[in-house]
Amino acid sequence: MKSRTDPPGDPINVYFREALLIGGEATRLYLVRHAQSQGNTGEDLASGDADLTEVGREQARRLGERLKTQKIDRVYASPLRRTQQTASAIADASGLDVIPKADLREVQLGQADYDIRLLPEKERQKVARLIMSEGTWDAFPGSEGSETARNRCRNVIKEIVNDHPGERLVVVAHAAFIQTFVSVVLGLQRDFIFYPFNASITSIRAKDGRFVLWRMNDIAHLDGMPAGFGGIS
């Protein structure tokens, strides 16, 4: 583990140092959603394992430059091509290797993994009602399910953090994975509470089994990319 010191900052921080994990001892976790893929643009909905688009490759390059400034120690990623390609750009910028982790995969949503529009109309209406009223992965027929997804997301992140205490760790995953884990950290019942943008960074600190959300859906590194081409519309 590298030795780091933090600037003293606001004196009020002394009151929240332990509660909010302020200081250099906590593990820094950077949850990154993969950059724009051909699945996101509709170019490849069939394979389930789409490559990045040209825009996505530029987003990934910018992620690498941004995270290099954080002096990251390790880069983990789900095994799918869109996450591996994003993670490779981040790792290359910092002279690191990508560590694949199967349990970082996307939440399995059954028919919705392909095209929920293929469901009968009554079934689609039922799914829509459950999404609004309950907001959990249980709304999707044939899905992995909320409890299973939450346990998987929680356990794999705990495993990664426990293996590298005090380090700065990048985890490249998927939108539903990030939504689920943030919901767990915040102690919420709903599984999806925000939309993680492509190539966004959600920062979490961890220590002694506790997790504190520090920053959510950060895309400052995408400034200047036009809406529809990697920027936010």
Which sequence ranges carry the predicted segments?
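Phosphate-coordination/substrate-recognition cap region in phosphate-metabolizing enzymes
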Residues: 2-19, 23-24, 62-129, 211
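Generic beta-sheet signal
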Residues: 29, 167-175
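Short glycine-enriched, charge-decorated loop/helix-capping segments at active-site entrances
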Residues: 44-52, 115-117, 189-190, 230
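Short glycine/proline- and acidic residue-enriched helix-loop micro-motifs
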Residues: 126-148
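Loop-to-helix element that buttresses phosphate recognition and phosphoryl-transfer chemistry
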Residues: 29-31, 36-90, 142-154
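Acidic, His/Gly-rich catalytic cores of divalent-metal-dependent hydrolytic chemistry
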Residues: 214-233
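Glycine-rich phosphate-binding loop signature in dinucleotide/nucleotide-binding domains
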Residues: 69-71, 160-167
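Domain-level recognition of soluble alpha/beta enzyme cores
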Residues: 188-212
